[in-house]
Amino acid sequence: MTHSKRWLEEHAKDPYVKRAKKEGYPSRAAYKLLEIHQKYKLFKPSMNVIDLGAAPGGWSQVAKDLVGPKGVVIAIDLLPMQSMLDVIFIQGDFNEPEIFNQLEAIVAKKTLTGQVDLVISDMAPNISGIKNVDQSRSLHLVELAWDCAQKLLARGGTFLVKVFQGPGVDRFLINLRPYFNQVKFLKPSASRSRSSEIYILAGEFLGYNQRV
C-alpha cells in the first residue's frame, strides 16, 4: 500500500476527523491544541495570540474561542484560509521582511505593548515521504517560528511549536532553554501514534535580551 493510500484509509476512519466535521472545526488538529490547553491552561480571556502556519484554521478557531471577544488572534499562512469572525488573517511568508513588518504593525495596533502573550505553530513541511528530508524541513520551520516568536513574544509569554523528532531537535531545545523558565516535550493523544510529530511547550519567556 502506498503512503497516500494508507493515509487516505486512516483519514477516513479517524475518529478525530469525524468529530471535527461534526463540531465544525476545519481540521482534526484542533483537538491537539484543546488537549494541550486542558492540561496546561495555555489560553486566558483577553490574551493576544499569533498562530503561525494557521491554515486551514483549526488552531485559530480554538484560540479565538478561548481568548474571547477582548482577545486578539492573528493568523498567518502561505495558503489561503477561510475567513473567521474576529480572527485577523495575513496571507504570506512571515519570514519575508514585508510580511513580517505587516504582522508587527498589526500587533502594535491591536495590543498595548506591541507584543503577544502566546505564539503557536502547527506548521509542517510538504511531506516528501523521505523521513530525513521531512524531519530536517520540519526543524527548519521550527527555527523560523522561534525567530519570529522571540521578536514579538512578551516577557512571561508562551511558545508552542510542532516538530518531527530526529537529529537537531535536542540541540534546538538546548538553545531554547535559556530563554524560558519551563520547556518540555508533549505528544497529544490526538496525534497519530505512528507520527513522529511532537510539540515543544516553552513557558515563562524571560525576554530575548534578558536570558539567564
UniProtKB/Swiss-Prot annotation:
Superkingdom of origin organism: Bacteria
Sequence positions that bind S-adenosyl-L-methionine: G57, W59, D77, D93, D122
Keyword field contains Transferase: yes
InterPro entries, per the entry: RNA_methyltr_RlmE, RNA_MeTrfase_FtsJ_dom, rRNA-MeTfrase_E, SAM-dependent_MTases_sf
Keyword list, A-Z: Cytoplasm, Methyltransferase, rRNA processing, S-adenosyl-L-methionine, Transferase
Record GO cellular component, one term: cytoplasm
Active site: K162 (proton acceptor)
Any GO molecular function: rRNA (uridine-2'-O-)-methyltransferase activity
Pfam families: FtsJ
EC number(s) stated in the UniProt entry for this protein: 2.1.1.166
Substrates-to-products reaction catalysed: uridine(2552) in 23S rRNA + S-adenosyl-L-methionine = 2'-O-methyluridine(2552) in 23S rRNA + S-adenosyl-L-homocysteine + H(+)
Localisation per UniProt entry: Cytoplasm
Major localisation: cytoplasm
Protein function: Specifically methylates the uridine in position 2552 of 23S rRNA at the 2'-O position of the ribose in the fully assembled 50S ribosomal subunit.
Family: Belongs to the class I-like SAM-binding methyltransferase superfamily. RNA methyltransferase RlmE family.
Name the UniProt record assigns to this protein: Ribosomal RNA large subunit methyltransferase E
Gene: rlmE
